[in-house]
C-alpha cells in the first residue's frame, strides 16, 4: 500500500458556494451577476420608478463571461440576486499539446495542463503567436466550476 502515489488535484475547492447574495439595487455596471443560471458581466442596467402597487424594478442586461451570450432579467430592487465569485489569473504559456491542451505555468512555478485551447479567433491567434515563438501570458477566468482562457497578451516581463 505504501508504494501507491497519493493523487494530487490541482483545482480543488473548499466546497463553499460558488455565489453570494447581493441586493439588486446594490449591483453596478461592469459587476458580475448570475442571470438564467450563468455567470454574467453587467453591461446595461436601468431602474424603473416605483408603481402604485409595488417596488422599483431593475432591468439587467449581462454578457456570459464564458460564451459571450446575452442574458436579460427584470427584478424588484429589494430582491436578492446571486453574484458569482470570479477569479482571474495570469499564466505563462509554455506549450500546446497535439490534442489542443495548453501547458500553463503559474507565478509560483506550478504547471497545469487541464485547459483546452479556446475556440474561435482567440484560439487561432494564440496558436499562431505561440508557433511564431512569442512569449505569451494567458488570462484564465474561473467561476461556478468553469474555467477558460479569455485573453492572451505578449509577456513583456521577460524582455527586460
UniProtKB/Swiss-Prot annotation:
Compartment(s) where it occurs, according to its Swiss-Prot or TrEMBL record: Cytoplasm
UniProt key word RNA-binding: yes
Signal sequence interval, chain numbering: none
PTM: Lys-52 undergoes hypusination, a unique post-translational modification that consists in the addition of a butylamino group from spermidine to lysine side chain, leading to the formation of the unusual amino acid hypusine. eIF-5As are the only known proteins to undergo this modification, which is essential for their function.
Residue positions where Hypusine is found in the record: 52
Superkingdom per UniProt: Eukaryota
Annotated GO CC locations: cytoplasm
Keyword annotations from UniProtKB, A to Z: Cytoplasm, Elongation factor, Hypusine, Protein biosynthesis, RNA-binding
Gene Ontology terms, MF aspect: ribosome binding; RNA binding; translation elongation factor activity
RNA-binding as UniProt keyword: yes
Biological processes per GO annotation: positive regulation of translational elongation; positive regulation of translational termination
Listed InterPro entries: IF5A-like, IF5A-like_N, NA-bd_OB-fold, Rib_uL2_dom2, Trans_elong_IF5A_hypusine_site, Transl_elong_IF5A_C, Translation_prot_SH3-like_sf
Family: Belongs to the eIF-5A family.
Role description: Translation factor that promotes translation elongation and termination, particularly upon ribosome stalling at specific amino acid sequence contexts. Binds between the exit (E) and peptidyl (P) site of the ribosome and promotes rescue of stalled ribosome: specifically required for efficient translation of polyproline-containing peptides as well as other motifs that stall the ribosome. Acts as a ribosome quality control (RQC) cofactor by joining the RQC complex to facilitate peptidyl transfer during CAT tailing step.
NCBIfam families for the chain: eIF_5A (TIGR00037)
Cited PANTHER family: TRANSLATION INITIATION FACTOR 5A FAMILY MEMBER
The name this protein goes by in its record: Eukaryotic translation initiation factor 5A
Organism name: Spodoptera frugiperda (Fall armyworm)
Designated gene of the protein: eIF-5A
